[in-house]
């Protein structure tokens, strides 16, 4: 699954882009406005075709207002709750993680690497940093659950809070990347303490 794309790359092209835009904004734009909001990623013709197809599927409603036609999500459509969940792959990843970790032993789970920076592809691995107690040893199990739930291989780095702080002080590149680009999925990013002296 491509965690960087709406719907994880399952619904692609103009149809996926239009559907993601309408689900995320809750707005009621015209077809031309949808096209402009997509920043030219798709032609006006392909946006109009996508809107037509989504209206035919019943997921999107069209309403005539004066000389214009506006589009909105049909909130009564049976697929909309699932589509809302799918439009946010990082949210789905968070759900997978929360279902398989003991939050009493884990302070934070942080997404980092290409998936966090927006440079991932469908076959990119998912890099996670787990900061927790020294007796937490579920990295292999967590990686398996993430792979099963998302379809991507998963690499898990594990730190205690003290180990993470020490790695920050040493200036370890991977920890710098985590602090710079990391997306907290559980808990929060550790705050870097200013050096004294």
Label the predicted regions:
Residues 1-107, 117-123, 132-197:
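Catalytic core of pol beta-like nucleotidyltransferases
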Residues 127-128:
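Conserved, compact domain cores that house catalytic/ligand-binding motifs in diverse enzymes
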């Amino acid at each position: 699954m491509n965690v960087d794309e709406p719907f994880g790359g399952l619904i692609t092209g103009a149809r996926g882009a239009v559907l993601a835009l309408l689900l995320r904004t809750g707005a009621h734009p015209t077809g031309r406005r949808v096209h402009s909001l997509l920043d030219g990623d798709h032609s006006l013709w392909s946006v109009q075709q996508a809107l037509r197809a989504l209206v035919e599927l019943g997921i999107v409603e069209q309403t005539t207002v004066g000389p214009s036609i506006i589009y909105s999500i049909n909130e009564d459509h049976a697929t909309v709750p699932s589509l809302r969940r799918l439009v946010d792959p990082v949210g789905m990843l968070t759900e997978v993680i929360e279902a398989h970790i003991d939050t009493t032993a884990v302070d934070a789970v942080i997404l980092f690497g290409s998936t966090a920076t927006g440079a991932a592809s469908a076959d990119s691995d998912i890099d996670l940093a787990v900061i927790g107690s020294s007796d937490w040893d579920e990295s292999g199990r967590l990686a398996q659950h993430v792979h099963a739930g998302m379809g991507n291989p998963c690499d898990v780095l594990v730190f205690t809070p003290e180990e993470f702080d020490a790695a920050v002080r040493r200036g370890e590149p991977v920890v710098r990347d985590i602090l710079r680009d990391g997306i907290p999925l559980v808990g929060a990013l550790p705050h870097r303490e200013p050096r004294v002296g």
